[in-house]
Amino acid sequence: MIVKIIKGDITEIEAEAIVNAANSYLEHGGGVARAIVEKGGYIIQKESREYVRKYGPVPTGGVAVTSAGKLKAKYVIHAVGPRYGIEGEEKLEEAIRNALRKAEELKLSSIALPAISTGIYGYPYEICAEKMVKVIKEEYTNFKHLNTIIVSLYSEEAYNIFVNIFERELAKEKNITLKMSP
């Protein structure tokens, strides 16, 4: 398993799936969600609305899949993270776990994730990084297809926090190669 931590724009990453930090109604009006629709095209919002019409709102911790429009990825996996102080940290783990499992179910080899719930939902970067690395350590041995996880961070602050936590937590993991590119 290769885990890459990258400072940059998730919409520019070459991965088979990119994860969108979404709300339950898959209305992509702000943050990373808005950037994904702006770069990938309205088809992503259109498919998201069709999903919600057909299946109802995505519960916190859940995921939904759409095409990726004009993005380099094949799919967008919309993960609904929790709001800080309102919904528990276990829902953040669940959103990350479900996104990774969905990529494996789709037989994808690579996925890019943002710092889910750290924007308007208010989670500190430290908690998100700790939950993400915990889920990766718990799940990676179950994956037959997924072999590259890219964590894409927009700010210098987020990048530095994730690098420190991932270096500390993955130091003893022999089967995970950690790569960083600022």
UniProtKB/Swiss-Prot annotation:
Transmembrane segments: none
InterPro entries assigned to the protein according to its UniProt record, in alphabetical order: Macro_dom (IPR002589), Macro_dom-like (IPR043472)
SMART domains, sorted: A1pp
Domain Macro residues, every copy: 1-170
Domain of life: Archaea
NCBIfam families: PRK00431.2-3 (NF001667)
Name of the protein in its database record: Uncharacterized protein STK_23830
Organism: Sulfurisphaera tokodaii (strain DSM 16993 / JCM 10545 / NBRC 100140 / 7) (Sulfolobus tokodaii)
UniProt lineage: Archaea, Thermoproteota, Thermoprotei, Sulfolobales, Sulfolobaceae
